[in-house]
Swiss-Prot record:
<dbReference type="GO" id="GO:0008652">
    <property type="term" value="P:amino acid biosynthetic process"/>
</dbReference>
<keyword id="KW-0057">Aromatic amino acid biosynthesis</keyword>
<feature type="binding site">
    <location>
        <position position="286"/>
    </location>
    <ligand>
        <name>FMN</name>
    </ligand>
</feature>
<keyword id="KW-0274">FAD</keyword>
<dbReference type="InterPro" id="IPR020541">
    <property type="entry name" value="Chorismate_synthase_CS"/>
</dbReference>
<keyword id="KW-0521">NADP</keyword>
<comment type="pathway">
    <text>Metabolic intermediate biosynthesis; chorismate biosynthesis; chorismate from D-erythrose 4-phosphate and phosphoenolpyruvate: step 7/7.</text>
</comment>
<feature type="binding site">
    <location>
        <position position="327"/>
    </location>
    <ligand>
        <name>FMN</name>
    </ligand>
</feature>
<comment type="similarity">
    <text>Belongs to the chorismate synthase family.</text>
</comment>
<keyword id="KW-0288">FMN</keyword>
<dbReference type="GO" id="GO:0009423">
    <property type="term" value="P:chorismate biosynthetic process"/>
</dbReference>
<dbReference type="GO" id="GO:0009073">
    <property type="term" value="P:aromatic amino acid family biosynthetic process"/>
</dbReference>
<keyword id="KW-0028">Amino-acid biosynthesis</keyword>
<dbReference type="InterPro" id="IPR035904">
    <property type="entry name" value="Chorismate_synth_AroC_sf"/>
</dbReference>
<keyword id="KW-0456">Lyase</keyword>
<protein>
    <recommendedName>
        <fullName>Chorismate synthase</fullName>
        <ecNumber>4.2.3.5</ecNumber>
    </recommendedName>
</protein>
<comment type="function">
    <text>This reaction introduces a second double bond into the aromatic ring system.</text>
</comment>
Length: 362
């Protein structure tokens, strides 16, 4: 329960942070889709731990293994199973915390719900669960690219209180990957890295904001009422670890505008295609994509695991002073960028198949 997402393009993840492996099963991917296996690995490398001085020092190769559903670099139309084996588990880091509820972790709520939790590493609540999502998202990206030349780009817009202004019309993948914090503004990126290092040296952590743009979006994706496109995007992105907020288009800033300021006037584009003069709606109106770029933002809280002393209790109610020893990111945002892209890709691939299935018979 709770480990699957999507209707037609369905993604189910499995595994724990300190178990033997983590993985994913993708169902519903159309057959005969040519798959670039290297691109799956490239996406996993982007979220891999130990990739820079501002990420967790845990060392994992995160090499993907394709178990089924792809042969000779083509999808078969059957379930695609992929796993990544865990290599650098250190359960000893958690031995002293076995019965202790770490502040703002899932330990307490998992205990309240199940009466038991994984003995080390956070179990299903660990960010290693997202390996399966990123692998599935890499396939969804290739599907969207083939059908519509759709491009999904995410980047770090804000770290703590340091924010970058980004021109979403000109930003490219190389700009995002040009530094370890994945902020396309080079000057601001340096300040962000310094801030993460300062906070980390103090044994603390920080959060921030990731922004995402989707270009060449097919019009008509999304369903009325309960399956609105932004509703599914919100569910997908808010299911990522450490997320605390979501907005699309003008978002909360739009609440300060009047209707005359916020409305996106319709204009005729090339070949008389319906366009909008502005894009406060963020490419979605009435829960359905209008063909304009989809623009969204996701807020991430500070990493819950910090080295500072914190007060908590154990399973017997005894007061404990805790200073975590596990290996964790002082800021999750640089590695969360491919996670955001993956979940957006999965949602759009699912809605693309739903749209084609319902509205393309004649």
């Amino acid at each position: 329960m709770g480990s699957s997402f999507g209707d037609l393009f369905r993604v189910s993840t499995f595994g724990e942070s300190h178990g033997g492996s983590v993985g994913v099963i993708v169902e519903g991917c159309p057959p005969r889709l040519e798959i670039d296996l290297e691109k799956i690995q490239e996406e996993l490398d982007r979220r891999r731990p130990g990739q820079s001085k501002i990420t967790t020092p845990r060392k994992e190769l995160d090499q993907v293994e394709i178990l089924s559903g792809i042969a000779n670099r083509e999808t078969l139309g059957t379930p695609i199973a992929m796993i990544v084996r865990n290599r650098d588990q250190r359960p000893s880091d958690y031995k002293e915390m076995k019965n202790i509820f770490r502040p703002s972790h899932a330990d307490g709520t998992y205990h309240l719900k199940y009466g038991i939790q994984a003995p080390s590493g956070g179990g299903r609540a660990s960010a290693r669960e997202t390996i399966g999502r990123v692998a599935a998202g890499a396939i969804a990206k290739q599907l969207l690219q083939k059908v519509q030349n759709t491009q999904i780009l995410a980047w770090v817009k804000r770290i703590h209180n340091i924010e970058a202004e980004i021109d979403i019309n000109t930003i490219g993948f190389a700009d995002i990957e040009s530094n370890i914090v994945r902020c396309p503004n080079q000057d601001v990126a340096k300040l962000m890295i310094q801030r993460i290092e300062e906070i980390s040296r103090d044994g603390d952590s920080c959060g921030g904001l990731i922004e995402c743009v989707v270009r060449n979006v097919p019009a008509g994706l999304g369903m009325p009422v309960f399956d609105k496109l932004e509703a599914d995007l919100s569910k997908a992105l808010m299911s990522l670890p450490a997320t605390k907020g979501f907005e699309v288009g003008s978002g909360f800033r739009g609440t300060f505008l009047k209707g005359s300021e916020h409305n996106d006037a319709f204009i005729a584009g090339d070949k008389n295609r319906l366009r909008t003069a502005t894009n406060n709606s963020g490419g979605i109106q009435g829960g359905i994509s209008n063909g304009e770029p989809i623009i969204l933002r996701v807020g991430f809280k500070p990493t819950a695991t910090i080295r500072k002393d914190q007060q908590t209790i154990d399973s017997e109610g005894k007061q404990i002073t805790l200073a975590s020893k596990g290996r964790h990111d002082p800021c999750v945002l640089p590695r969360a960028v491919p996670m955001v892209e993956a979940m957006v890709s999965i949602v759009l691939a699912d809605h693309l198949l739903r749209q084609r299935g319902q509205c393309s018979l004649w």
